Amino acid sequence: SVGFKAGVKEYKLTYYTPEYQTKDTDILAAFRVTPQPGVPPEEAGAAVAAESSTGTWTTVWTDGLTSLDRYKGRCYRIERVVGEKDQYIAYVAYPLDLFEEGSVTNMFTSIVGNVFGFKALRALRLEDLRIPPAYIKTFQGPPHGIQVERDKLNKYGRPLLGCTIKPKLGLSAKNYGRAVYECLRGGLDFTKDDENVNSQPFMRWRDRFLFCAEALYKAQAETGEIKGHYLNATAGTCEEMIKRAVFARELGVPIVMHDYLTGGFTANTSLAHYCRDNGLLLHIHRAMHAVIDRQKNHGMHFRVLAKALRMSGGDHIHAGTVVGKLEGERDITLGFVDLLRDDFVEQDRSRGIYFTQDWVSLPGVLPVASGGIHVWHMPALTEIFGDDSVLQFGGGTLGHPWGNAPGAVANRVALEACVKARNEGRDLAQEGNEIIREACKWSPELAAACEVWKEIVFNFAAVDVLDK
């Protein structure tokens, strides 16, 4: 006998190992598994471990040419999801040798690859990953990080303010640049290309870059503050993307932008490396994330996409608002905001954090709150996100009845009032509206904004909530 027996055997015989002691070098994954009727949870968890590592559907001759014990993924724990009849959390450990160094692309190709189409599973969601320090050290991470960005901008002790230029599509480059200038002159730190502004017939990228650079230099000269506009370098090829980033650097602007999910992790990591080498900050938009992360039983939670972005590289990333028009429960949002900013984050299931994560000094990422927010939200945003964040008001700036610059003034006054009140010991959560009303007395721009948006709310329950 050669020790080979053809045929199909249950995954759990090889890949379900409840006695396994995880190693410090393992990548750990928490999957929400919904097995098909009749499939035991142990078999489903083992199938996930197998199909995302060394396994296939049948025994093969070449298994004997390597050490499966060294390379296989292992399902080492399964727990039932509270309040759900047929959902389980399957914990899987992957040996580090399965993954190419410095490649988010390779990591995801294994862990969230073909296994998500596996017939024995009705649904599968990756809830969290523990990335070991040994693997993190193979990544550059964010081009600069929070402290270096503050030093570059010379801005401390408050959140940064931004605005997405609207309408997002259709403006000529010159009119677009005019809107940028008005917002920056009014007191914002940044303006932003919308995620789908690339290089369309109505506004080619080079023209936009030139007019926006002119706008921010003019605003800098008038205000004495350093200003930025997120020039979207996202393109159809990596080569074109880098060409646009090179032109931005030649113009001397401080920051460029990338749509990291539609652009892809390979392109994003290349751009992050270019940005560090050339002194550019990198703003990241998460367009397409809700396709992946919004359903509670299938896909991938945004906290995983956030960790992947910190590894791939970005200085800012959109992270929901809690109070605006886009999905995001407070505890869950603050959980992944900490994973973006902090160096060490403890396991905390009450905030959706399944594993303790040590980032071993990888630079942090500023979370960007954007989507349906306005001046009345300023106290809540300041209280929820703290100083190390970017608060981005698109319609909440450009929708001001007096124009773009007064809209920017209103936001800056509201922010300064909230920061001052907080520093004096006032409770933003309880006294927020009163603080804004007091500031209105000496800012007619803020008073006008408060009148326009006094009744705007987005009262819809979040889809992705914690298991109770």
UniProtKB/Swiss-Prot annotation:
Site (Transition state stabilizer): K325
CDD domains: RuBisCO_large_I (cd08212)
Cofactor note as given: Binds 1 Mg(2+) ion per subunit.
Location of the protein in the cell: Plastid, Chloroplast
Residue positions binding substrate: N114, T164, K168, R286, H318, S370
Residues bearing the modification N6,N6,N6-trimethyllysine: K5
Cofactor(s) demanded: Mg(2+)
Highest taxon of the lineage: Eukaryota
Modified sites of kind N6-carboxylysine: K192
GO molecular function annotation: magnesium ion binding; monooxygenase activity; ribulose-bisphosphate carboxylase activity
Recorded family membership: Belongs to the RuBisCO large chain family. Type I subfamily.
Note: The basic functional RuBisCO is composed of a large chain homodimer in a 'head-to-tail' conformation. In form I RuBisCO this homodimer is arranged in a barrel-like tetramer with the small subunits forming a tetrameric 'cap' on each end of the 'barrel'.
Name recorded for this polypeptide: Ribulose bisphosphate carboxylase large chain
Organism: Solandra grandiflora
Lineage, uppermost ranks: Eukaryota, Viridiplantae, Streptophyta, Embryophyta, Tracheophyta
Gene that encodes the chain: rbcL
